[in-house]
């Protein structure tokens, strides 16, 4: 009998074991779709980004007008730009839902997969930040100035570090050029890290909503979940197209329609919506270094999740007390997102400080405590 090329060819065999014959738990819900949706987002962003880079000029005197040129003069340039800008928002919607799924169902106990995921989150955030600077509007310029300036809080080397990143004494042409270089390079590093993420995931296999061992009940990935993923792609790409076609500027900042001007500071400097929760945590601490540390820790705390897991059950499916804490965390993150977009004045400052304390308390105190309480209630 002739060997099956799908199972014998060195390259096709890898694809087969990852996407076709992969044994998958039969009961995973639609929340398990977001990994593949992130892959689609990344591919879409790389393709649209590549076409934008063909027409974009990374120079302070031309960047803003080159973006206008893309939207006005390039065939379907407006569509490519709108898909790219709003694609970033969909990327973050998917990534936050993906992380939420991981927290809820205990996926963080696969430590290698989880830690690469945390690194991926940092990489995606860095990519989005440097990308936001490229159109060289007011919010691009001042966002870059404010966020890079945070590094000056690092003792001893801070000021030197900031000037080194800027390539001068302020955000200028050198900064824009290097940010374009980073923005072009990072998505390919993300793609590489994503392959590692999958590699480690396939060492163990997926979790499932119950958190129990699913070895006795596996089904092949194709056709069951390949078609299920396809439906997810269709829904997301439809939503993205609708947003890009009908209200492309819904999630943007009006200040970015004004070319960058170092002499005029916008009244409210704020990042894109997907960074607002972390920005609110940064602003809630009066000390500069303290704020920067809180900002980094608000993301890095995810890496501590395996250490903070006290329950003898993996998933939250049968753990009502921790479920309440999880949804409190979701609500708190939404409150932080709202506060991050508000001016620095009462009552917003107070709400932000309270929400920041609650954010860290849920992770560090409530999750481990509730796990312990649930163990006791079950006489474990």
Swiss-Prot record:
Signal peptide: none annotated. It is found in: Mitochondrion inner membrane. Its cofactor is heme b. One of its GO terms (molecular function) is metal ion binding. Coiled coil: none annotated. InterPro entries: Cyt_b/b6_C (IPR005798), Cyt_b/b6_C_sf (IPR036150), Cyt_b/b6_N (IPR005797), Cytb/b6-like_sf (IPR027387), Cytochrome_b (IPR030689), Cytochrome_b_C_euk/bac (IPR048260), Cytochrome_b_N_euk/bac (IPR048259), Di-haem_cyt_TM (IPR016174). It is a multi-pass membrane protein. Its main location: mitochondrion. GO terms for biological process: mitochondrial electron transport, ubiquinol to cytochrome c. Keywords: Electron transport, Heme, Iron, Membrane, Metal-binding, Mitochondrion, Mitochondrion inner membrane, Respiratory chain, Transmembrane, Transmembrane helix, Transport, Ubiquinone. The chain crosses the membrane at residues 34-54, 78-99, 114-134, 179-199, 227-247, 289-309, 321-341, 348-368. Heme b b562 binds at residues 84, 183. Binds 2 heme b groups non-covalently. Heme b b566 binds at residues 98, 197. A ubiquinone binds at residue 202. Heme 1 (or BL or b562) is low-potential and absorbs at about 562 nm, and heme 2 (or BH or b566) is high-potential and absorbs at about 566 nm. Component of the ubiquinol-cytochrome c reductase complex (complex III or cytochrome b-c1 complex) that is part of the mitochondrial respiratory chain. The b-c1 complex mediates electron transfer from ubiquinol to cytochrome c. Contributes to the generation of a proton gradient across the mitochondrial membrane that is then used for ATP synthesis. Belongs to the cytochrome b family. PANTHER family: CYTOCHROME B. The cytochrome bc1 complex contains 3 respiratory subunits (MT-CYB, CYC1 and UQCRFS1), 2 core proteins (UQCRC1 and UQCRC2) and probably 6 low-molecular weight proteins. This is Cytochrome b. It comes from Xenopus laevis (African clawed frog). The gene is mt-cyb.
């Amino acid at each position: 009998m002739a060997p099956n090329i799908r199972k014998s060819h060195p390259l096709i065999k890898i694809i087969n074991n990852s996407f076709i014959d992969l044994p998958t738990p039969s009961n995973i819900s639609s929340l398990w779709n977001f990994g593949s949706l992130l892959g689609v987002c990344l591919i879409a962003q790389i393709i649209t980004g590549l076409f934008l880079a063909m027409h974009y000029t990374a120079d302070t005197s031309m960047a803003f007008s080159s973006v206008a040129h893309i939207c006005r003069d390039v065939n379907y340039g407006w569509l490519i730009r709108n898909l790219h800008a709003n694609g970033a928002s969909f990327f973050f919607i998917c990534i936050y839902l993906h992380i939420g799924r991981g927290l809820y169902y205990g996926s963080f106990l696969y430590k290698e997969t989880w830690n690469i995921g945390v690194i991926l989150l940092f990489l995606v955030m860095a990519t989005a930040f440097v990308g936001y600077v490229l159109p060289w509007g007011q919010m691009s310029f001042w966002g870059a100035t404010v966020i890079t300036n945070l590094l000056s809080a690092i003792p001893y080397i801070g000021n030197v570090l900031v000037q080194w990143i800027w390539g001068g004494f302020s955000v200028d042409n050198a900064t824009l050029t290097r940010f374009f270089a980073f923005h072009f390079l990072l998505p390919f590093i993300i793609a590489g890290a994503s392959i590692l993420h999958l590699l480690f995931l396939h060492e163990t296999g997926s979790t499932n909503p119950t958190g129990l061992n699913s070895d006795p009940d596996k089904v092949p990935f194709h056709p069951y979940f390949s078609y299920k993923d396809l439906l997810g792609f269709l829904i997301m790409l439809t939503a993205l197209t609708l947003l890009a076609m009908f209200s492309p500027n819904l999630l943007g900042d009006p200040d970015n329609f004004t070319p960058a001007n170092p002499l005029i500071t916008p009244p409210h400097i704020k990042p894109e919506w997907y960074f607002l929760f972390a920005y609110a945590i940064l602003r809630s601490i009066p000390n500069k270094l303290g704020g920067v540390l809180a900002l980094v820790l608000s993301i890095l705390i995810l890496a501590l999740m395996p250490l903070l897991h006290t329950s003898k059950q993996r998933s939250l499916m049968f753990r009502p007390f921790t479920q309440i804490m999880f949804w409190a965390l979701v609500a708190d993150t939404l409150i932080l997102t709202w506060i991050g977009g508000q001016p620095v004045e009462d009552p917003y400052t107070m709400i932000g400080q309270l929400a920041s304390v609650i954010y860290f308390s849920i992770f560090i105190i409530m999750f481990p405590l509730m796990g312990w309480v649930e163990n006791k209630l079950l006489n474990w």
